[in-house]
Design a protein with these regions (language model features):
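Short, solvent-exposed loop/turn elements at beta->coil junctions and helix N-caps
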Residues: 98-103
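Ribosome large-subunit tunnel/peptidyl-transferase-proximal elements
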Residues: 1-91, 104-117
Length: 117
């Protein structure tokens, strides 16, 4: 009996998916945009939005929560110095997905995930 239908499987194990979401979110926060497939983009948006919402109080507990998922100190510093002040007045909707078309090799639907300015 399958119960957890709220997330996409993405053809990887749960531990691989967790690591992939952390790595893709780190890249998104560092470069402010990434290119990936549409299902992965939708999952990264969910993960990144939750992290940015957790970071908005900008206190010690928020920093610990962000360090639990993002281990790169430069990215965490950017989150609290650049991104949190940018989205201070915004209640969600920090990212957007732009569809690109299909990838040449395997015809996978591609998208750009970018942080809203």
């Amino acid at each position: 009996m399958i119960k957890n239908l709220n997330t996409r499987k993405l053809a990887v194990t749960p531990s691989h998916k967790k690591a992939m979401m952390r790595n893709m979110t780190t890249s998104l926060f560092l470069h402010e945009q990434i290119t990936t497939t549409i299902p992965r983009a939708k999952e990264v948006v969910r993960f990144a939005e939750k992290l940015l919402t957790k970071a908005k109080p900008a206190d010690l507990n928020a920093k610990k929560a962000i360090y639990a998922d993002i281990s790169n100190k430069d990215v965490v510093k950017k989150v609290f110095d650049v991104l949190v002040p940018r989205y201070k007045e915004r209640n969600g909707g920090y990212t957007q997905i732009l569809k690109l078309g299909t990838r040449k090799g395997d015809s996978a639907q591609m998208a750009i995930v970018k942080l809203v300015i």
